[in-house]
């Protein structure tokens, strides 16, 4: 197990470029017949990702599983679907399996019968009472992930960067509610491809940027506009001196904005019906 991100399998084996990711996904289309491919392409990929995110969190909530474990499961799911196209295998089974494996890797194991029972109670039409189905899917999942299962998350980077901000300039000290908002954005970032394309600290910085700069209009309700402007300038000075890649960070911000724009048009009920057409 690597002690840090820079020597980890996450960086050495699972840090992709946008071009590589697009090529992989394009290649996956070849396995489907034209009819099914047309049905899959009719799905809004953002809505599918949001739906899978809600499935993971619903199962996690029912099992009282910590957010970090669910984040690990989401990374597994995103990686898996760069190797296996959505629609080839029961997504509800893959979700349950990803959570099961993540619990073991993050040293908070759940019994396979517990996972099976809870998943079946949520999705009885798609989950068998037989726990060996998850066991079989576990081997498939781990094989497609290349057995690289240790995940580094942006949560630690968030706290490190916020501490550095406070030391650099008291004016840009993040308030507890700002930390919470940024933490929630990081949770949402797992719906995207950001964790395949960027180191954790880039994702953390992008979410901090969105909180401090893009949500500054909220601060204007309690602070004079000049004070808000001065704070943003101080943050941008910190950002410039931090040596964090600006272009990568802005790309992340744009991806997060795209997520939220598409999330506004998301209907869980409609997405569930459309996904059922693909997997039946």
Swiss-Prot record:
SMART domains: CYCLIN. Its main location: nucleus. Signal peptide: none annotated. SUPFAM superfamilies: Cyclin-like. One of its GO terms (cellular component) is nucleus. GO terms for molecular function: cyclin-dependent protein serine/threonine kinase regulator activity; RNA polymerase II core promoter sequence-specific DNA binding. It is found in: Nucleus. GO terms for biological process: cellular response to heat; meiotic cell cycle; negative regulation of transcription by RNA polymerase II; positive regulation of transcription by galactose; positive regulation of transcription by RNA polymerase II. Belongs to the cyclin family. Cyclin C subfamily. Component of the SRB8-11 complex. The SRB8-11 complex is a regulatory module of the Mediator complex which is itself involved in regulation of basal and activated RNA polymerase II-dependent transcription. The SRB8-11 complex may be involved in the transcriptional repression of a subset of genes regulated by Mediator. It may inhibit the association of the Mediator complex with RNA polymerase II to form the holoenzyme complex. The SRB8-11 complex phosphorylates the C-terminal domain (CTD) of the largest subunit of RNA polymerase II. Component of the SRB8-11 complex, a regulatory module of the Mediator complex. This is RNA polymerase II holoenzyme cyclin-like subunit. It comes from Yarrowia lipolytica (strain CLIB 122 / E 150) (Yeast). The gene is SSN8.
